[in-house]
Structure formats: C-alpha cells, structure tokens
Amino acid sequence: MTMTTWLRNAIILAAMVAASGLALALKPTIKVADAGPKINLDSMIPREFGEWREARFGSSQIVDPQQKELLDKIYNQTLSRTYVNPRGYAIMLSIAYGSDQSDGLQLHKPEVCYPAQGFQLQSRTVGTLDLPTGTIPATRLMTTLGSCSEPVTYWTVVGDRVVVGSIQKKLVEMRFGMGGKIPDGMLIRVSSIDGQAERAYALQNQFAESLVGAVAVEHRKRLTGISQDK
C-alpha cells in the first residue's frame, strides 16, 4: 500500500467516524411526553358533552386487531367509545396516543388500518374542522364493507402541530429533533355507520367541536395542536 493510498483510506475512515459521531450526537433522546403532564385518555375525554352521551351497550374497536402486538408497541394508550345523541345517531370515537414518534414508531393511519380489516377505501379528501381552539386540517375517508358504509373523519397531532401527510410529519419531527427532542403523537378518529356521507361528516364535525370544547383547557392542545389560524 502506497503512502497516498494509506492517507486516502485514513481520511475516509476518519470522515466515517466523524459522521457516525455527529449522527449519534444529533440523535434525539429527550421525549417531549416526559416533560409535560402525563396523558390519561380515559379521564381526559368526557363521557358526556353537548348532546352526546357514551353508549353503554357497546364500544368501538381500534381497527386491525390482528396487528395488536404492533399497535401495543406504537401506542402507549388507546381509547374507543361509542356516543349517541338524543335522536339515536351513533358516532364511534377512537384515540391512539404514542409517546415516541421516531422513525421506527409511527402512528397507524386509517388509510392503512381499514383496508387491512377488509374495508374498501372509496375516497379520501382533506378539509378543515372549525374547533374551539381554531381551524385545523382533517382527513375524510369513505369506507365500505359489503353493504355497510362508514364515513370517517380523523386528524393527527405530532408534537404541537396537526399534520397531514408524511412530509409535514417529518418536518415537525426534524424541528423537534434539532433540539434533541422526540415528539409524541395522537390520532383522533370519529366515524359512523351511515350511507349518507354529507350528513355523517356534518354530524362528525359537530361531535368534534363539542368534544374539544368539553375537554379541560390544559388538555386541548394535546387534541388539536397549535391552531393554524392563530
């Protein structure tokens, strides 16, 4: 081996070691969830609010139970309830919370979970929800299973922002990562068995507005992030 070759290899090795050390130094290690009040979904989410009351005759389920082991790894807590209004209209609420939204642990989107359960994804649109905390983006799905139609509205909070899509999510993760922090994440999903999509989405909007308004002020940012219009 000539001196030139040896020197080149030494420089390459030194660069690799430096890059490895830099990557390790920049790797986020502080969980945002550990710095704030602990999350307890069962006590945070009221069982009665506005015209909605929890239905004691049954409850909704987190979709995709075959992947329970994976879901348990991704989420620290999940909550599933069914609420009804005085006219008997039922809305299913599912909330999943994960304290670690790093690359290896990602929130499970309904676009993935529903088809895994045998549902057909008929449409997907992105709109907004007007909540007591401000306006946030929300995703609306139309899913079907046989003759059953289930319109879905959901939104995802990563750290302190509502995100739509993987690019927005990654940007929020990078912002936290620059400070050495790992953001937490929450996915809030409301759905109903209803063949009339427009009616379903309107009632889901009303439900979400009432829900957020009934949650204690100190917990609202967990559900809705920092609103985009403030």
Give the label of every model feature segment.
Residues M1-T2:
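N-terminal Lys/Arg-rich, disordered targeting/topogenic segments
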Residues W6-A14, A18-S20, L24, K31, ...:
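A short, solvent-exposed beta-edge/loop patch
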